[in-house]
Curated annotation (Swiss-Prot):
GO terms for molecular function: DNA binding; DNA-directed RNA polymerase activity; zinc ion binding. Binds 1 Zn(2+) ion per subunit. Belongs to the RNA polymerase beta' chain family. RpoC2 subfamily. It is found in: Plastid, Chloroplast. The gene is rpoC2. Its main location: plastid. Its cofactor is Zn(2+). It comes from Nicotiana tomentosiformis (Tobacco). In plastids the minimal PEP RNA polymerase catalytic core is composed of four subunits: alpha, beta, beta', and beta''. When a (nuclear-encoded) sigma factor is associated with the core the holoenzyme is formed, which can initiate transcription. Keywords: Chloroplast, DNA-directed RNA polymerase, Metal-binding, Nucleotidyltransferase, Plastid, Transcription, Transferase, Zinc. This is DNA-directed RNA polymerase subunit beta''.
Amino acid sequence: MEVLMAERANLVFHNKAIDGTAMKRLISRLIDHFGMAYTSHILDQVKTLGFQQATATSISLGIDDLLTIPSKGWLVQDAEQQSLILEKHHHYGNVHAVEKLRQSIEIWYATSEYLRQEMNPNFRMTDPFNPVHIMSFSGARGNASQVHQLVGMRGLMSDPQGQMIDLPIQSNLREGLSLTEYIISCYGARKGVVDTAVRTSDAGYLTRRLVEVVQHIVVRRTDCGTARGISVSPRNGMMPERFFIQTLIGRVLADDIYMGPRCIATRNQDIGIGLVNRFITFRAQPISIRTPFTCRSTSWICRLCYGRSPTHGDLVELGEAVGIIAGQSIGEPGTQLTLRTFHTGGVFTGGTAEHVRAPSNGKIKFNEDLVHPTRTRHGHPAFLCSIDLYVTIESEDILHNVNIPPKSLLLVQNDQYVESEQVIAEIRAGISTLNFKEKVRKHIYSDSDGEMHWSTDVYHAPEFTYGNVHLLPKTSHLWILLGGPCRSSLVYLSIHKDQDQMNAHFLSGKRRYTSNLSVTNDQARQKLFSSDFSVKKEDRIPDYSDLNRIICAGQYNLVYSPILHENSDLLSKRRRNKFIIPLHSIQELENELMPCSGISIEIPVNGIFRRNSILAYFDDPRYRRKSSGIIKYGTVETHSVIKKEDLLEYRGVKEFSPKYQMKVDLFFFIPEEVHILPGSSSIMVRNNSIVGVDTQITLNLRSRVGGLVRVERKKKQIELKIFSGDIHFPGETDKISRHTGVLIPPGTGKRNSKESKKVKNWIYVQRITPSKKRFFVLVRPVVTYEITDGINLATLFPPDPLQERDNVQLRIVNYILYGNGKPIRGISDTSIQLVRTCLVLNWNQDKKSSSCEEARASFVEIRTNGLIRHFLRINLVKSPISYIGKRNDPSGSGLLSDNGSDCTNINPFSSIYSYSKAKIQQSLNQPQGTIHTLLNRNKECQSLIILSAANCSRMGPFKDVKYHSVIKESIKKDPLIPIRNSLGPLGTSLPIENFYSSYHLITHNQILVTNYLQLDNLKQTFQVIKFHYYLMDENGKIFNPDPCRNIILNPFNLNWYFLHHNYCEETSKIISLGQFICENVCIAKNGPPLKSGQVILVQVDSIVIRSAKPYLATPGATVHGHYGETLYEGDTLVTFIYEKSRSGDITQGLPKVEQVLEVRSIDSISMNLEKRIEGWNKCITRILGIPWGFLIGAELTIAQSRISLVNKIQQVYRSQGVQIHNRHIEIIVRQITSKVLVSEDGMSNVFSPGELIGLLRAERMGRALEEAICYRVVLLGITRASLNTQSFISEASFQETARVLAKAALRGRIDWLKGLKENVVLGGVIPVGTGFKGLVHPSKQHNNIPLETKKKNLFEGEMRDILFHHRKLFDSCLSKNFHDIPEQSFIGFNDS
């Protein structure tokens, strides 16, 4: 103390708060100066002082002390603004998901960090004695980040997988969390808790394995005499200065170090602070130091190779168990660090990049040839400079030059005006951080249903040639064209065919899919329409008036349009030459036995129609009977239309039936029950007897109706009929008795002896004379059918337009399928169709085209962009195209096909549509969609996509378009005309009409569908629409039909919206069909912004776009699925592979350490260390020839892999701020890398191939045999290394006990009990510390040591004895740098 008092005069007085780090420094200085005991004494006094002060001044903490940082509000607002812009970019498809995630995390992380930095100055200014503030920097409990969560914002959390949740917690704990934030923070907290539990066991196991590997390593010698070392150079910029100092302090030099001619340090001298500082200042040559790697022995280590003991700053003592210390020092931080869970989610590439900012305002100039455009990791455009780039900034009076280093990103364009402090470039983080990057896969899922398209070529990954994994060669968009698919496992669905229309409430099997996609503006309309248009369905006879008709169109093409019924399940079947479009009526849905009716379009087998042949027929379910009976036409004559028998395939029953054409409206059906029985069957009723309902007739038959039984025996079978009705025994006077088989109309009096009454319905009187008895009259009920024109195909196929359109006529004819009086037999339960409504094709005999006798018909499948559609096409064979010139439209002149050729030669498919009122009402009430099947290659139906109509908007209107005056008024009221939000193409809802250019009116009163405000104009019919449609095939050729025969080719419902623009103005962009347009791209000059989508229709003055969602993908991303494939919500679209920094926290770090130590593959891309090693082995052996090659190859490989392993492990720990001395890691790595694998049988047969032996042993054996042993280096994981030691007892006590012991017994292994564990197991003295001397006998040592060393050792021993009592003297003489025992200096003296 006196000395201190004396020196106090010239000491500097530090008036400064001492925090944790300052305290650490102070203590280390004290230890350096005064040694351990003295220091502990001083610290004791400091502790006492501290407690006295703390007792005097207590701190209380109240909730008012938690002051929120004032700048938080606008910081958070700013961050939200940025995320909003980012979200928009992502929505437009400018940024892909990974970039969005990265950027949003960086935005929030920066905000959170900024708040954290604000916290301290804020407290210092407003309330320096705030207890929270004092606490957070005391270094005791609580650190800045915890306080930051109390008063700043909690920031980002990670989910259970360790991925970031990109929704930050904006509140702090003082303000309180919202529900969402609370749940997210529970994720983070739970992850912390779970990780702590899980990782503790992991870390414990890691420690156990590490100790297992190195437990036998003890310091047994002072010097192994190696000449090798590892060179460390301070000049090399790779290693920061502090790491450099850490590496050197406590090591022993392997070589003298010269500064010019002067030697500033000698070999075997240990390095202290002073020496290190000298090295740094002099920037001397690379310094060669001794490490455990260079130690000559395998099973122990010498003092000089180990260096100073970290505990007391002296050279390590003999007999110290350095192996166990090393294992623990690596394993222990693992258990501690599990508690540090960092919430950065590993997105940063080793810290945020550095920025270069502009020194002043001005214009920026640089040489554009030296940079090339690229994307930053946030998806922003930038320029990458490959060499140094000089940027000049010209402000008003001065030029600034800024130098931008290579590999940086320039964020501004040439000649751009920049403001002072604006970020102009981003310097890529140093190369050193690249090592702990990790490749991570990120899947992007589709958030809507639809079809997939992509706008660029893709490569098939070679291993998935036939799969659906594609690689993107360049940055491009993937598009999901919206539409709702419907999944069903029912086979039933295969009868839905492409382009069928259906209600959104359609029944599929027993399951009901309901979609209310377009309910938005419908409610209003439902009210308006429900009063006028209620269709009464009390009679339960379905009203077919709202069916679409079959259309005949340009060049005699008949394109069928599917039929939609309000509650119909619509199925269309395509057979080889026949379409059936069935309908279900309500009646049938309840009573499912009835087969469904349908319109069948049928083509003759040879494909040729003669005149008057039947094109399509419709079996009306009302003319269908289940029971057998007789048809009567009364007195009306009929004639058979088709003379030859016509083969009908109907419901699988082939029957020859002539067709009889009806002349009248009435026909009668007399029901009877008929059973046809085999001749051998026993009948339980007599002929002419009367039975009741459900009487037993034969063993397994019961009667369905009651009545008179007639039995007729034919050749091989019995026909049994039951006639229902009344039986009269007429008197003589009754006239009726003379008739038999007569139909009596209602109203005729019927007299009889007892009573007389009027007949209400038609009846059929039949006279029956049984044998031996008087005859009687059977009065049978009759079912009357009348055929009205109201409910037949006339509504389906109005003849006007057909006739007007080029001479083709479709006549509608009703046929009765059975002759007059013919008995009709129903087979089991099938129904019998009595009347068939047919559509007869005919054409006028024109003078010019009189030669035209036959028409060819075929079903056409058109495939556009992978979708298949069916059309029925009828061509008159010799018809010239005569009408093209007549009806040309001026608007058509600009719309030729792309190559400029005239479009008249392209065969168009035109269509005309007409609607009835029920159709309108129903299309307004009900959301509908169209079935749109996607076929796979074998044309089996795979899935349906139901495209339904939603979010339609029509943009415009523009100037110079002539409108009706009515429409003009409505435009004034409402510039955006809502066309009905569930717009679809025709057939599903109202036509989309260019109201001022209608070419073809069928209707009497024109109505305006486009504006539902003008309801008074709604009459029962309305205008037919024409569209300019273009067809695109796979090669992108455009079939552009003549505008005067405008065609609808996509009768399916999409998400559409309209964009009107006037082609009179020049358009800024030329729109091609099928083109994809991103949102916010302006097409016309003053046009509104678009939604994103694909152009599916280009009109003279507007385009229709099908909504689509773009997803951006970068090169190397994997696309799942095929082009045009249906995707469902939540399906994987793309997989990105991106890099994120490894070890965001120790939870990610520990597994990395383990991976390195177990020598597993670390990242998916870079080669494993093992492979690298093999490469080295081969090359060097080839260069140097065999005997030396193996040795040197092995040595070099081992050296290289060792250093890289040490660096990798250090990186993980350093990223956590954990300092572990390199030598601990080196000891363990040395054990992993010191084995070689014998690769082939030498002549000597000393080792068997595949045996693992130590490298030194292999060298010695090679020297002894004077023959090359072939071996190669292997990297063992720590588990394998602990199972390949010299002691089988230690191996057996670790793992696989039975196997290890059995093998050892077979080989006759000997355990020399050199390690700790073997001795512990067997209860011997541990050869460490005090038990160490007993192991090494001097005699044993002398046997295997060469002569000179013996002499040297003797000399050492003598000197030690002489100098022992002078030790203290020496100690004080030596400079502060060397805390050495004299022995060492003498050794140094001897060696030099």
